[in-house]
Amino acid sequence: MHYITPDLCDAYPDLIQVVEPMFSNFGGRDSFGGQIVTVKCFEDNSLVKEQVELDGKGKGKVLVVDGGGSLRCALLGDMLAEKAARSGWEGMLIYGCIRDVDVIAQTDLGVQALASHPKKTEKRGIGDLNVLVTFGGVTFRPGEYLYADNNGVIISPSPLTMPE
């Protein structure tokens, strides 16, 4: 499904919240949307890895990763992005960095993040799954919906359909 966030904003002005503009599109999909699953972690992508490796777990879903806005290492690389695409994830919104951007740009996955960084994270198994996370002026709730394209990122408490 192709989403156009300005059209969704126009059609559902009372339903949506707009995330502050800070993300860049790195993925192979121009737009993505789906039900939110959250991970809260800081410079440790163990839970990200765990989520994307679950077969079929991501069907129709978007993984929202609150990495604390860290610009010191990458929470996503090419291998995890490819696993996420194979597991059916629609996309990932990462409040932090990614790496392997040239490969991720060719992967059938929506990916938006703050920046790229060549260093990988530590793997300490520290983080929280499906908790409320807040960044970009909004609170992301597991089970709600996220839609993203090159215009920006929006969230909604219920699924949205593109207007005719």
Swiss-Prot record:
Positions annotated to bind substrate: G77, D78, M79, L80, R99
Cofactor binding notes: Divalent metal cation.
UniProt-recorded Gene Ontology molecular function terms: 4-hydroxy-4-methyl-2-oxoglutarate aldolase activity; metal ion binding; oxaloacetate decarboxylase activity; ribonuclease inhibitor activity
Keywords, sorted A to Z: Lyase, Metal-binding
InterPro entries: RraA (IPR010203), RraA/RraA-like (IPR005493), RraA/RraA-like_sf (IPR036704)
Protein's UniProt keywords contain Lyase: yes
Cofactor field: a divalent metal cation
EC annotation from Swiss-Prot or TrEMBL: 4.1.3.17, 4.1.1.112
Pfam families on file: RraA-like
Residues that coordinate or bind a divalent metal cation: D100
Broadest EC class assigned to this enzyme: lyase
Reactions listed under catalytic activity: 4-hydroxy-4-methyl-2-oxoglutarate = 2 pyruvate; oxaloacetate + H(+) = pyruvate + CO2
Annotated SUPFAM superfamilies: RraA-like
One biological process term in Gene Ontology: regulation of RNA metabolic process
Similarity comment: family membership: Belongs to the class II aldolase/RraA-like family.
Function: Catalyzes the aldol cleavage of 4-hydroxy-4-methyl-2-oxoglutarate (HMG) into 2 molecules of pyruvate. Also contains a secondary oxaloacetate (OAA) decarboxylase activity due to the common pyruvate enolate transition state formed following C-C bond cleavage in the retro-aldol and decarboxylation reactions.
Subunit structure: Homotrimer.
Protein name, per record: Putative 4-hydroxy-4-methyl-2-oxoglutarate aldolase
Source organism of this protein record: Pseudomonas savastanoi pv. phaseolicola (strain 1448A / Race 6) (Pseudomonas syringae pv. phaseolicola (strain 1448A / Race 6))
